Structures are given as structure tokens and as C-alpha cells.
A protein has these predicted regions:
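Acidic/histidine-rich, metal-coordinating catalytic segments
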Residues: 110-124
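A short acidic (Asp/Glu
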Residues: 42-44, 124-129
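C-terminal domain-tail junction helix/linker
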Residues: 3-9, 45, 180-220
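Short, basic/hydrophobic alpha-helical segments
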Residues: 93-114
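Active-site proximal helix-loop segment of RNase H-like, two-metal nucleases, encompassing DDE(D)
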Residues: 82, 151, 159-178, 191-195
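Mobile genetic element proteins and their domesticated derivatives, centered on retroelements
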Residues: 33-35, 74, 80, 99, ...
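Extended, low-complexity cationic-aromatic segments
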Residues: 13-100, 212
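RNase H-like polynucleotidyl transferase catalytic core
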Residues: 58-64, 136-158, 173-176
Length: 220
């Protein structure tokens, strides 16, 4: 939710992210957005009836809950690739391992990875120190240029939009367990990556200063 009144902290973080989004693509400094979501795992207790002409597939109202899985979305909007990592939990340790995967597997040749994410409490360099010895934690901290969306401004994180695409195209049905979820998400991810699906961010700082003028402190 966008704040209803002037909020200097919000506009400062918003303009920081918008400045990042206005930069030209630099392969040595790739832009990567990160966000998380969860998926309730639900198994069918009876075999669903398949769809027929004029009639959708039917599922029994009884089902079995199999817990919740977490999904970390890494999205490079200017390069058109994404990677979704499925985990059992959503902790500082899980987050730290995702960042190491991003650094060493997906962007090993980058001089610096420009990282945009929301202000969740685990999205901090401290998480790396919880997960790894200090020299490794420091190495990883310095691999990133850290940027945060403002509080109540997660819509500025392009990974959130990509999670919405994942939810509508892949997760809008019952999925029984983590293994099936990981398989389905990987298939979706590979299809999107094959087509280099990018994000074309349009909202700029100049537009924000007009359309969201009420959020800016006013001066005589």
C-alpha cells in the first residue's frame, strides 16, 4: 500500500530504486531482483475427473495438506532470465545460500551484482554472516550493490511481478509435494528463459514526482 501522505523515507527509497531501473544494461553489473513467495502443498485424495467439452476438470472437495514450500525468485529483467529456488523454509540461512547461488553460479563473471529487493528483515548482509564464516560472508557482501524498495513499496520490485506470472501460469492448481513443485517450477522457468522474457519498466523518477506528488514533503 502506498502511504496516504508525505513520507520522505518512502520517496528516498523509491527514487533510489527508480534510478537503478533507469540505468542502461551493463553485463558487468547485472541487475537482479529478488523476492519470495509460498505455496501450500495439497494432494488429491481422489483422482480428479478430466475435462470434457464444455466442462472443466473437476476436483473432489476433500484434499490432504502437505505443508508449505517457499520459493525464492531471482529475476534479471534486462537479460530475460530467472531462477526459482524451492526451499522448505524461509530463513536468513536459506536467503544467504540463494545469494551465494546468484553470485557464484548465475553471475560468476560480474564485477558487481546490482541487487533490488524489499526490506524484509532477513534481506541484510548480516544473513550472510549467519550462514558462512566471516571471510566468505564478506566476499559475498562485496559482490552486491544493495538496494531496497521502501516499506509498503514492494510493487517496485520487478521480481514480485515475475512471481505473479509464475502464480498465474504454473501455481494456480493443486500441487502435492515439494518434488513436484520443483519440477513444475523448473519447467516454467526454462520455458520463460528460452524465450528471454524480459520486463520493460516504464515508471520513472520524473513521473513519480508528478503522479505521487503527495508523498513528497512540500516546501514554500
Amino acid at each position: 500500500m502506498i502511504p496516504p501522505e508525505a513520507n520522505a523515507a518512502f520517496v528516498a527509497d523509491m527514487e533510489d530504486v527508480l534510478e537503478v531501473y533507469q540505468r542502461p544494461h551493463d553485463p558487468q553489473r547485472p541487475l537482479v531482483c529478488i523476492d519470495e513467495s509460498s505455496k501450500q502443498l495439497i494432494a488429491e485424495t481422489r483422482t480428479p475427473l478430466p475435462a470434457k467439452p464444455g466442462q472443466p476438470a473437476r476436483h473432489d472437495y476433500e484434499y490432504e495438506r502437505n505443508g508449505v514450500a517457499n520459493l525464492f525468485m531471482m529475476f534479471a529483467p534486462l537479460e530475460g532470465w530467472r531462477c526459482v529456488t524451492v526451499t522448505d523454509r524461509h530463513t536468513a540461512i536459506d536467503y544467504a545460500h540463494v545469494l551465494r547461488e546468484l553470485s557464484d553460479t548465475h553471475c560468476p563473471n560480474a564485477v558487481k551484482i546490482v541487487l533490488v529487493q524489499d526490506n524484509l528483515n532477513i534481506h541484510k548482509p548480516a544473513s550472510l554472516y549467519e550462514a558462512f564464516p566471516a571471510p566468505e560472508a564478506r566476499r559475498l557482501v562485496e559482490r552486491f550493490e544493495w538496494h531496497y524498495t521502501p516499506k509498503h513499496g514492494s510493487w517496485l520490485d520487478m521480481a514480485e511481478s515475475e512471481l505473479g506470472v509464475l502464480a498465474s501460469q504454473c501455481l494456480d492448481r493443486r500441487i502435492a509435494d515439494k518434488q513436484i513443485l520443483a519440477r513444475e517450477v523448473t519447467a516454467w522457468q526454462d520455458h520463460r528463459n528460452k524465450h528471454h522474457a524480459k520486463a520493460n519498466w516504464q515508471f520513472t523518477t520524473d513521473e513519480a514526482r508528478v503522479k505521487l506528488k503527495r508523498l513528497y514533503p512540500q516546501f514554500e
